[in-house]
Each structure stands twice: as C-alpha cells, then as structure tokens.
C-alpha cells in the first residue's frame, strides 16, 4: 500500500508524462507536493521504485517510467501545478516548410487541425546568444497546442533547461507576450541584444532568469534590462 504522498507523486508523474511526454523536474515535484526540499522527493521516488510502481531509466537525466498505477487511481487526485508543455516527438529531419509562411495560420489540412508556425532562428538554453533572426522556415503543429494569440518557434541551443524537459536541438513553441508570471518559462531579451530561454522569477525589484540545470547560475538583472518576448507553450523533439 502506498502512503498518500507516494500516491500523489506517482499520479503527478503519470499525468505530467501523459500530458507532455516528459517527466516533471524534481523542483516541480517538490512544489506540487508542498515539500520543503528535494530530498523528500528522492525518498518518495526510491520507495515507489522499490514497490515496483516506477523505474529509473539508465544513462538519461531525469528519466522515469511509470510501470503501474494504484487500483483506486483517479485523475482528480492528481495535483496540478507548474508548466505542462505539449510535446510532439518525431523522426529527425528538417521540418518541411508549409505555405504561406504566416504566424498561426491554418496549414493545408481539410479539418484545419494543424497550423503553420514560423521558425525564427535559435534561442540559447545556456549562456545568452544573439538570437531571434528572420523566419527561416515554417513547421506544422496541432492547433490545440497553441490556443489564442500569435506564436512562433525557436530552435534550442544549449542544456541549461534540461531539468524542465527541454534539450539541445528541441524546437520550442512560443506565444507572443510581453509579460510573465513567476515560474513561467520565457524568451527573455537582455539589454536589447541577447535572447535566452529561462524560467522567469522576481527578486525584489530585480528580475531573475533561472536555469533548470544546477551547472548554471541564476542571473539577476535590473527590470529595465530584461524584456519578455514570449512564453513557452510547447515543444517538438526529433530522434535519429
């Protein structure tokens, strides 16, 4: 029999993977269960692994697999907090352009179930780089991934967001926005020169751009140095 916290964590992992295709980070698990530290999450995961509910996948960062669920499983028991991106996974290869190259227009699809989103260049998930360029090509994404507003896509370079399930080579889908809430993953323009993909935080009157990789430090800026360019709503991943 599982404890309440063990069951909450198991269902949180299961629902997140069902929604986004990637497991939540340890920070997201900690916040979802209202725990004070990540050590409690490590203990819960070990207990779930020992009881045969999950297993850790070797040689992969933050890789978990849910093997079984409690008999009394109900989606309503699952805590829902933090970022839950939509994920498309497919074969490696350059996405084929879809005409016309306009933001969030219906692609050539009889049911208009897909839309064309422009890929605007690369974004750093690491040390900021000079970023957003002109439209290089378009990709087709499911319409229900986007919701309202204007969208664009960026190719990720770097590994600073791996604990948020965002890897080097992924394509992120961004909703145009000039504002963000604490905890949102955003495209941030620093000093009108460099763009980076980071989690948005506030530190008093300052803005913190927080990585999701312990190898990278959180960077603090004055509010006049950072402009939010959009918020992450989904990602696309390709494999060899």
Swiss-Prot record:
Enzyme active site: 160, 198
Keywords recorded for this protein, A-Z: Autocatalytic cleavage, DNA damage, DNA repair, DNA replication, DNA-binding, Hydrolase, Repressor, SOS response, Transcription, Transcription regulation
Region (Disordered): 78-113
Catalytic activity: Hydrolysis of Ala-|-Gly bond in repressor LexA
Domain of life: Bacteria
DNA bind region: 26-46
A Pfam short name: LexA_DNA_bind
GO molecular function, a single term: DNA binding
EC number: 3.4.21.88
Annotated positions for site Cleavage: 125-126
One GO biological process term: DNA replication
Subunit field text: Homodimer.
Similarity field: Belongs to the peptidase S24 family.
Reported function: Represses a number of genes involved in the response to DNA damage (SOS response), including recA and lexA. In the presence of single-stranded DNA, RecA interacts with LexA causing an autocatalytic cleavage which disrupts the DNA-binding part of LexA, leading to derepression of the SOS regulon and eventually DNA repair.
Protein name: LexA repressor
């Amino acid at each position: 029999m599982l404890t309440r916290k063990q069951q909450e964590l198991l269902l949180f992992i299961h629902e997140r993977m069902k929604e986004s295709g990637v497991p939540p980070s340890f920070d997201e698990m900690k916040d979802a269960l209202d725990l004070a530290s990540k050590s409690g999450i490590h203990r819960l995961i070990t207990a779930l692994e020992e009881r045969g509910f999950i297993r850790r996948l070797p040689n992969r960062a933050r890789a978990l697999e849910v093997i079984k669920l409690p008999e009394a499983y109900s989606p309503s028991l699952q805590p829902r907090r933090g970022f839950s991106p939509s994920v498309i996974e497919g074969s490696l290869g350059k996405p084929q352009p879809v005409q016309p190259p306009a933001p969030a227009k219906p692609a050539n699809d009889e049911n208009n179930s897909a839309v064309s989103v422009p890929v605007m260049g690369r974004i750093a998930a690491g040390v900021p780089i000079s970023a957003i360029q002109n439209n290089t090509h378009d990709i087709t994404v499911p319409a229900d991934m986007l919701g309202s507003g204007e969208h664009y896509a960026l190719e990720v370079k770097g590994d600073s967001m791996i604990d948020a399930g965002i890897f080097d080579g992924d394509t992120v889908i961004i909703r145009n926005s000039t504002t963000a809430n604490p905890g949102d993953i955003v495209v941030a323009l620093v000093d009108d020169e460099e763009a980076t993909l980071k989690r948005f935080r506030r530190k008093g009157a300052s803005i913190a751009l927080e990585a999701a990789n312990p190898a990278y430090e959180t960077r603090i800026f004055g509010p006049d140095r950072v402009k939010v360019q959009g918020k992450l709503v989904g990602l696309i991943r390709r494999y060899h």
